[in-house]
Amino acid sequence: VLGWDPAFRTGCKLAVVDPTGKVLDTVIIYPTAPQKRVEDAKKLLRDLIAKYNVYLISLGNGTASRESEQVIVELLKEIPQKVRYVIVNEAGASVYSASKLATEEFPTFDVGQRSAVSIARRLQDPLSELVKIDPKSIGVGQYQHDMNQKHLGESLEGVVEDCVNKVGVDLNTASASLLEYISGINKALAKNIVAYREEHGAFTNRKQLLKVAKLGPKAFEQCAGFMRISGGENPLDATSVHPETYQAATELLEKLGFSSQDLKRGGLAGIGRKIRDYKAMAKELGIGEITLRDLVSELEKPARDPRDEMPVSYTHLRAHETLSDV
C-alpha cells in the first residue's frame, strides 16, 4: 500500500508499506502548486508501483487532496498495473506524526513522512492507527472542551479498550499501540510481538506467540483469544475461539459432519439448528453449555465484527473518471 500525504508548498509525502505495515520506502514529490512537477512525480510513482508491486494508494483527504487525486487518476490511465486508490480520513494524523510515540517509532522520519505512513496503515487496519491518537484529537463533539478533561479522557480510553477487545486484532498488522489494549499484553510485550513479526515475517499460527520474548503461558492464555490470524495454518486462528477450546470445536464440527477447513467459506450458518440437546452435547464435549452456545455462535459467523454493518466512509473514483465526470 502506498500512503499519500497531500500538500502544496512542502510537497506530497509518500510512504510504501508491506502487508504487515512495515515501511519499505518514503519519497517526496511536487505535483501540486506552486512547483507543479507532474511528470517527475508520475515517474517516481511508476517506479514505486513497479518496484514494490503497489496495488492500492491511500490518499489523505486534507489540503491538496483533490489536486493529488487528479494526478493519480491520470497516472492510473497510463500504467499497465491494476492499481486502485482510496481517499482516507486523515483526522488526527498530524497530531500523531508530531507526537512522542511517532518519534519513538520513526526517529529518522520527519513529520510529513510519519503522516504518510499513518495514512497508508489506516487503510490496512484503521483501529491499529487510531489508537495511537488521543481520542480527543479526533473530534468527538463540539462541546468536548466544556467537559472535565480527565473524565472525558477516561471515558474515551474505556471505549477504545472495550472496542479493541470486542473485535480483536489482526496479529499480522496490529501496531504495538493497539496490542497494548489486549488483555495480558503490556507495552513491553506489545513491542516484542511487533519485533518478532518484523524479524520472522507474518504469524501463521497462534502458538508462535509463545516464541515471543517474555510472553509466557499465562500471558498467552489471556491474549490468544483476541488475536486473529487470517489465512493461517488453522482456520480457527481467525476466530475468537480460544486455543483451549480448539479440541472441543474440532470434535463438535466432526459430530455435525464438518471440519475446521469449512470455516474458510465464511462460516457455517445454521449449524446451531443441528444440535438438538445443547446440555447433552456440552457434556459430551466436556465444556459448559454457555461455552458451547458461544462456540456455535462464533462458528456460524467467524470473527463477528460490528464494523461490517457500518456504512463505508471512504470514496474513490475509477481510473477512467475525472472530476468533471462526477
PLM region spans:
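Edge strands and adjacent loops of beta-rich recognition modules
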Residues: 306-314
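Residues that form generic nucleotide/phosphate-binding pockets
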Residues: 48, 126, 155, 159-163, ...
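Accessory alpha-helical DNA-binding modules that contact the DNA backbone or grooves
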Residues: 166-300
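Charge-patterned, long linear interaction tracts outside catalytic cores
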Residues: 125-196
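Short, contiguous strand/loop micro-motifs
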Residues: 31-32, 59, 106-107, 162-166, ...
